[in-house]
Amino acid sequence: MANQRKPILPLLLEKKPVELVKPSKHTHCETLSLSTLDNDPFNEVMYATIYVFKANGKNLDDPVSLLRKALSELLVHYYPLSGKLMRSESNGKLQLVYLGEGVPFEVATSTLDLSSLNYIENLDDQVALRLVPEIEIDYESNVCYHPLALQVTKFACGGFTIGTALTHAVCDGYGVAQIIHALTELAAGKTEPSVKSVWQRERLVGKIDNKPGKVPGSHIDGFLATSAYLPTTDVVTETINIRAGDIKRLKDSMMKECEYLKESFTTYEVLSSYIWKLRSRALKLNPDGITVLGVAVGIRHVLDPPLPKGYYGNAYIDVYVELTVRELEESSISNIANRVKKAKKTAYEKGYIEEELKNTERLMRDDSMFEGVSDGLFFLTDWRNIGWFGSMDFGWNEPVNLRPLTQRESTVHVGMILKPSKSDPSMEGGVKVIMKLPRDAMVEFKREMATMKKLYFGDTN
């Protein structure tokens, strides 16, 4: 059920010099402001994502040439991405300065076949990052940096990967998917993207007032659960494959536990509750401490009027579920899932989004953030829908795999739910969950996973 990431073979690449790809048509220079959510300090981090394409013997086109040309055309519609990010001298906020510099584009080759790497499914993160372009960022200075870079890596089998580095400050996961979908549409021969890009960052700017900011988690600082395994730099990554049948059986058993419930549970509500509980056990969090599940809730359709379809900036709000470790342990999965469902609904309450935007502005003004022990904090993000915006077939069929990575130090506080690799037909309709934990805690996590699987699914295979 779980596969530990490891470099199956040495990944040696021959790289060509980086080039800057500019818009294919002239676009005017300007400086663009970002939204309150874009400016959240936690969003100034690079997304690294790898899209894996199998060889297509019938296609004699060069994917590098197609993607280079498509990128140049894309930047006419998404011209801010060919600018640079910097902080305003007047208020210290991020802004995109567009002078037409272009986007870093890198080409690499490998003598390996993608199949020998299991289509990068089990590669160690640090090895897989070689398939993604490097963007050097000094977050403490005001040095400009590119918000986007691409790397195309060709393999001996004829397959290739597209590696993207894209700053979270400019777009969220939905926005990343929208941009890459537009890129592959243009590479397939379309004259323009099917979805028109929209900036409109002013729609999500909070009003500034004189109230003090409320630091998330400050009300439980000193009460948060701790783990003997943390802190540590010895962190490992696991891919947990959960089949469609197992998810259905888990949902069915939970619905039997609470027949009074009028709404069914979503896959996210079920899996987040299940994994949160197992993670708490694996880390051996102290029973009286508080553990927190963070949930990102999309708000594109919540605003009045809703954000346009082509909006690619950050558009989500975090909500939280808080329990003591003992409460989490003693609660049924259905009870926890019901709490997750209720927490998600708070993001839709009138005034909640406006207040969250105001509070984010206050925290940035005061330069305040949570600095307490965060062993018991866990975010589980859902990439199943935002990772695939639409068809990406531009001559090599759909990607056989998608792999998000982190370019900062490995964090044990974030997990991801994704669609499974298409290289394994038995996983159709299922999910894969990526988890990072201290090495010893991961052993416990796998043991707990096997026990829970036997309880809910009736087997340990």
Curated annotation (Swiss-Prot):
Its EC number is 2.3.1.249. Optimum pH is 9 using spermidine and coumaroyl-CoA as substrates. GO terms for biological process: polyamine biosynthetic process; spermidine metabolic process. Pathway: Amine and polyamine metabolism; spermidine metabolism. It comes from the Eukaryota. One of its GO terms (molecular function) is spermidine:coumaroyl CoA N-acyltransferase activity. Keywords: Acyltransferase, Polyamine biosynthesis, Transferase. Mainly expressed in roots at low levels, specifically, in the root tip. The active site is at 168 (proton acceptor), 393 (proton acceptor). It catalyses: 2 (E)-4-coumaroyl-CoA + spermidine = N(1),N(8)-bis(coumaroyl)-spermidine + 2 CoA + 2 H(+). It holds the Pfam family Transferase. The keyword tRNA processing does not apply. InterPro entries: CAT-like_dom_sf, Plant_acyltransferase. Monomer. Belongs to the plant acyltransferase family. Spermidine coumaroyl-CoA acyltransferase that mediates the conversion of spermidine into dicoumaroyl-spermidine. This is Spermidine coumaroyl-CoA acyltransferase.
